[in-house]
């Protein structure tokens, strides 16, 4: 089978990139696999090229490269095929529209898999008849803007399948009633770590992820203040950095100082690989308001750490068995987090049992098992292709109505944004 993945930027780092690379490497043992990265901003991918996988790009952002595309006239013209509702829309352009379209028109693959909503929509709009078309959802439907959800409900009907990473999100997609589109929940895969399992006797709690508001590290620090007061021999290590718009490192550092936790809570920055750092702890903590899946939960469990996590939508509750391989607590409940941590901290035997249970339970996320599930879906779709009646375009009337409403919505959003700028300027003058 020839499989082609379409990825936003395979040269960067992130959960979608990591899980795509892991899946591609597993599939490459039996199939011909390529990853097509829309963008390339560096010479070598941060995660390396998966063994047996071909990696190529469509738009070169390297200024020192002879193929630099930043001066192409279409690079500065807005995208019209890639949907405006996707949060990455401003990074796309008329050039990406053309390059992605040309790629899809010529790709020689049995299965084409797009890996973010905007690319899923573009796949539906530009791919010709022939290959099985799969849109992967690595986030959650309810977290998308209204504009993007509207395009999803309209365009995904042209796909063969949509896969989500949780059953809860699969139910949300099924509620869209996309005729003829197969919808399955297939979790992300996490390979077995190349380090020995964590020592349950280690007195370290580990957390990892971007330093952004949704992760609620401020709540975790407050909860750990109670832990440190009761068990001053324990430490909390938080790994990760913020993104360009929401780096909370300074605020968290001030909070640590104000709570007199300098000897107990540490902002560790980014670690790659992360597995050796997980293995230095005996507990993991997740305090997010929402998680599309919960990659760090599985990563921690694969290293032998039970996880205390908020029972937020959607992932944690489908990964952790409460009271067996971790604890689930209410969202935004500082006292519940500290109580759950202390319950495991103060129970050495219980913590060791939970660690063993985490190792066993997390085996279901092994790449071999997850790849086999994807292969099963794709093979069934390919086998039924002859009798499948998937449309390759919408009726002219329906398409015109969708486009007209979309244009009106875009005009409304633009007017609202301009009004907001004007109001802010007037406030500065008053």
Where are these regions (language model features)?
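Conserved donor-binding/catalytic core segment of Leloir-type glycosyltransferases
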Residues: 4, 194, 198-215, 221-224, ...
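N-terminal strand-loop element at the rim of the active site
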Residues: 7-13, 31-87, 185
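Glycosyltransferase donor-sugar binding loop
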Residues: 37-42, 208, 235-251
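Donor nucleotide-sugar binding/catalytic pocket of nucleotide-sugar-dependent glycosyltransferases
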Residues: 135-138, 142, 156-194
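Nucleotide-activated donor-binding/catalytic signature segment of Leloir-type glycosyltransferases, i.e.
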Residues: 249-269
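Aromatic "clamp/platform" in nucleotide-sugar-dependent glycosyltransferases that forms part
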Residues: 270, 289
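Short hydrophobic beta-strand element within catalytic cores of glycosyltransferases
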Residues: 306-310
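Conserved acidic donor-binding segment of nucleotide-sugar-dependent glycosyltransferases
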Residues: 321-323, 327-334, 343-348
């Amino acid at each position: 089978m020839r499989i082609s993945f379409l990825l936003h930027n395979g040269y960067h780092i992130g959960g979608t990139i990591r899980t795509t690379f892991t899946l591609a490497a597993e599939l490459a043992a039996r199939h011909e696999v390529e990853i097509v990265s829309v963008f390339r901003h560096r010479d070598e991918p941060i995660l390396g090229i998966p063994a047996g996988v071909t990696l190529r790009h469509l738009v070169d952002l390297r200024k020192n490269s002879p193929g630099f595309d930043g001066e192409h006239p279409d690079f500065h013209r807005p995208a019209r095929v890639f949907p405006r509702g996707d949060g990455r829309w401003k990074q796309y352009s008329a050039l990406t529209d053309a390059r992605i379209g040309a790629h899809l028109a010529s790709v020689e693959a049995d299965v084409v898999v797009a890996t973010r909503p905007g690319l899923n929509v573009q796949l539906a709009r530009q791919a010709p008849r022939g290959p099985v078309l799969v849109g992967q959802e690595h986030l959650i439907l309810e977290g998308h803007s209204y504009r993007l959800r509207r395009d999803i409900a309209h365009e995904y009907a042209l796909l063969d399948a949509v896969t989500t990473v949780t059953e809860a999100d699969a139910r949300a997609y099924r509620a869209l009633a996309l005729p003829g589109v197969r919808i399955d929940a297939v979790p992300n895969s996490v390979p077995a770590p190349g380090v020995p399992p964590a020592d349950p006797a280690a007195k370290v709690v580990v957390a990892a992820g971007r330093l952004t508001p949704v992760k609620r590290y401020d709540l975790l620090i407050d909860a750990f203040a109670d832990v440190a007061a009761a068990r001053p021999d324990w430490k909390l290590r938080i790994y990760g950095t913020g993104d360009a718009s929401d780096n909370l490192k300074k605020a968290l550092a001030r909070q640590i100082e104000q709570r007199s936790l300098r000897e107990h809570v540490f902002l560790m920055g980014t670690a790659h690989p992360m597995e050796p750092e997980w293995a230095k702890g005996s507990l993991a903590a997740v305090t997010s308001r929402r998680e599309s899946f919960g990659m760090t939960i599985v990563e921690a469990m694969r290293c032998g750490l039970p996880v205390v996590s908020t029972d937020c939508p959607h992932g944690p509750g489908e990964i952790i068995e409460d009271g067996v391989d971790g604890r689930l607590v209410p969202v935004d409940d500082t006292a519940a987090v500290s109580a759950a941590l202390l319950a495991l901290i103060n129970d050495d035997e219980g913590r060791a049992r939970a660690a063993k249970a985490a190792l066993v339970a997390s085996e279901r996320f092994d790449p071999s098992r997850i790849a086999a599930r994807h292969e099963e879906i794709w093979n069934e779709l390919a086998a039924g292709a002859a009798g499948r009646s998937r449309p390759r375009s919408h009726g002219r009337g329906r398409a015109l109505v969708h486009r007209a409403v979309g244009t009106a919505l875009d005009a409304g959003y633009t007017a609202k944004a301009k009004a907001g700028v004007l109001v802010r300027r007037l406030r500065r003058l008053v």
